Amino acid sequence: MERDLERGPPGPPRPPLGPPLSSSIGLALLLLLLALLFWLYIVLSNWTGGALLVLYSFALMLIIIILIIFIFRRDLLCPLGGLGLLLLMVTLLLIALWNLHGQALYLGIVLFIFGCLLVLGLWIYFLEILWRLGATIWQLLAFILAFFLAIILLIIALYLQQNWWTLLVDLLWLLLFMAILIWMYFHGPRHTDEHHHDDSLPHPQQATDDSSHESDSNSNEGRHHLLVSGAGDGPPLCSQNLGAPGGGPDNGPQDPDNTDDNGPQDPDNTDDNGNTDDNGPQDPDNTDDNGPHDPLPHNPSDSAGNDGGPPNLTEEVENKGGDRGPPSMTDGGGGDPHLPTLLLGTSGSGGDDDDPHGPVQLSYYD
């Protein structure tokens, strides 16, 4: 089974109503041919059988109709073929009533009335099926009028007992059932299922694209929402692409030994002017041995009130550790103005600056 690239893989297949076997079709065609021959012999012969001739001819026509339904629309055998079969049984009962007498005749009449009621009920049920399939009021009225007209003409044929009238009545019944078959072919379930398309369902390709976009957004969100924690006995773990030069200030909780002599940010702990590089970004010329990654000069009287502290490297700084500026958390990275916003802070409840054992959490958001 080929897949529809627009709708994706097909769902579980429905059990189809397979075509009849070739042997059964051949047998049905043979029976249909024999029924046509018998019907033509009865109608076109000079045999005068009276009302029984009309009933035999009508019974053969019903057999022909049932065989046609079996060959071309086997799925309609239950409603439409059942209607023809019930009409055939009522016709055979009426033929039997022609030779009955006494109590058997009365019982046969009761059965005949019961059979006629069954035919009427099955016809109403079939009209309801046509209504559910989309038949209009005018189409239903046309079928109802044709059905009752065929019954009235059959009664007239029983009264006239003429072969030519019987031929017309039988052809009218055949035309009625053929009209129903043709209508069912264009409006029945088999025809509508082939062109049915449910647009309420999401397109599989669209669902795949939505999921891919969602996964991309989740991955981007995961890249931009980082949390870096450090233990109390060592420097915090930080990304090398996010930080600023220099180490933490003296006496800061982020520097275990309170000095930056042995920090990874400055290999020789000196700058170009021979000054020690204990506090990193506070060099006079704002340069060190590691190159041009030092931040720009800062204003000692800025709004941060750090009195010579490190420059404000981020757009938003949350410092719960004290009045000193936040320590540098990376080694040698430059103060790129295009870096994401850093959010720095300690997890201590009281903001104790002298507690070196408090875990440090660092996160940033775009």
UniProtKB/Swiss-Prot annotation:
Q: For the motif Interaction with host TRAF proteins, what are the positions?
A: 204-208
Entry GO CC: host cell plasma membrane; membrane
Q: Where is this region: Disordered?
A: 194-366
The residues exposed to the Cytoplasmic compartment are 1-23, 73-75, 128-139, 185-366
Which residues are connected by disulfide bridges in this protein? none
Annotated InterPro entries = Herpes_LMP1
Tell me the protein's name. Latent membrane protein 1
**Per the UniProt entry, what species is this protein from, by scientific name?**
Epstein-Barr virus (strain GD1)
